[in-house]
Amino acid sequence: MARRVFVLGGHTTTFIGKKHPDFIWKRHPDFGKRENPTLEDYIVQSVTGALEATGVEAAQVEKAWIGNFVGELFSSQGHLGAALVGAHPDLLYKPVMRVEGACASGGLAFASAVESIRAGTDVALVAGVEVQTTKSAREGGDILARA
């Protein structure tokens, strides 16, 4: 019989896209003074927010997954398992797998964690994180067309 799987909770970061008043672009009054959140910033916010929301200690996490589509092209960072581990010192040396499946990357990461729990893992952490505003519309469209 398969083990039952429970989702304890999660966290959603604030969306700051190109139409958001806090999005920094060349005509924004803070242009040159501050920058938009990076992919790594969102990973840290997602992980720490989920741990706080669920009351789970990072040390209790046995395995983790991160879903992302072409982080290496939008953010020059493809090795996102290390970025997730960097979100909390108690995640150091935990196995983390990046899952990529275009628009389904986060969902596939979640499905992978569910299967791991059914196989015996007690506590898994999943993050789905994207930053796709680092390129021009033309470059971004070209990258997204690769899906």
Residue ranges and their predicted role:
Residues 1-96, 118, 128-147:
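Conserved "HGTGT" condensation-loop signature of ketosynthase/thiolase-family condensing enzymes
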Residues 97-130:
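Active-site-proximal alpha-helical scaffold in enzymes
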